[in-house]
Amino acid sequence: MKRDGNTPLGGLNRTKDRHTDMVPNVKSLPGSRREIAALQSERRRVAFERARQAPWYRGKLDHIRVDRLDDPEEWQKIPILDKDALRRFDHAGFMREFCVAPRNRIAEYWRSGGTTGKPVFYPRTYEDVAFGLISWGRSFPCMGIDANDLCHIAFPIGVHPAGQVWARSAQLYEVGMAWVGAGNVVPTAAQLELIDTLKPTVLMGMSSFALHMANSAEARGIDACALSVRKIVCSAEVLSNAKRQKLERLWGAEVYDVFGMSEAGLMGAENAAHDGIHIWTDLFDVEVVDPETGRRLPEGEVGTFCVTPLWTNHATPFLRWNSGDQVSYIERSSGSGPYAELFPMIRHANRTTGFFKVRGVNVNHTEFEDEMFGIEGITDFQAVLETDAATDLERLRLRVEVGRGTTADAVDAQLSAMVKARFEVSVLVDTVPPGTLAAEFEKSIKAPRFVDVRA
């Protein structure tokens, strides 16, 4: 595979100095997996040296041998970092402990995602932003999106990078972009009108909002399959198989999943084979580890996803960041093309926090969602774990929206029977008007489909 230009390692320039890196040719890819391995070896050392500058890491890395960072046994001695550690600090404390860049190098801030806990605002230098744009933009050619496409982006356009950084990255890859924004800013009816007017071929947004848009279109007598959208790109929440199939059926479109986070960037995307998410391993050093021991797991085993950004680390040099995702690592795709040849994949299992315990019974969120979206008459739902005021016992309440031709009584009976048989818990079912849940979900970066409001 031919490299682009005269820069080494597939266009990713070597370190200019200990603080900044040269910006690469954005469309250049490494020439081989061997080349990526050499690049990872070099960049691990840069990441490690930058982390040693952060006050939080003082005393935590002294036992690590820098000359042995490529040895998994040595690398695994580095402590794993997670969001709970960050939430102990207010913003000023976080900046003191983790930020190693001077104020005059900070270009912008990226807000953390998530539906629980206090958000964290990560400083990003001009170099971080440049590499971040590459990480988001790579998703377009990986998914077969090019200059012949127009994307309608329905993520929030603001301090969270999923909207504005992704939209900006499209310009680098010569992909058309309609900067629409989330449904709480541009109402669903207006978004459908824009799709009808501008004729985008790609819809980018949370899977929950894409479902809501299709349901809203049906309520207005519009067949979403007859619209111009041919691909749907989902992010910010786990895409279950049932939800993917429902989106494909409602829109008549091919659905793609991607994977990323504010702590690092967009780390990968599916290709046309849809057999996993290809991870840009020249930009990110990734591990799937045993959550108890922190040791790397063999291919195919489910464990905790950890990432060390190799380039977006000029301000916050995180090592072995625990994203809270349960995934498996797969070396090869059944697909073809440079992304399949160069980059390994991950496959989602579920989030580590992805279960309710209802009176001693574990209810897995992903499995529950699969069952819910597999029911024909249900268009959307929210599961609420609450406390019964009369008995002081916990109970599960389902708020559901139903399609035309489906009665609330029929759904109540069907859901109660399904949940009891499949998950061995009883539920209360509330049918809410169409659009109720989407209006609530639009206020969050990630749809709060499972909510714990116990007293």
Where are these regions (language model features)?
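AMP-binding/adenylate-forming catalytic core of the ANL superfamily
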Residues: 203, 311-423, 441, 445
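Nucleotide 5′-phosphate-binding alpha/beta core
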Residues: 2-111, 117-134, 138-142, 147, ...
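ATP-dependent adenylate-forming carboxylate-activation enzymes
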Residues: 178-193, 364-366
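Conserved AMP-binding/adenylate-forming
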Residues: 230, 239-334
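Adenylate-forming
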Residues: 200-244, 254-263
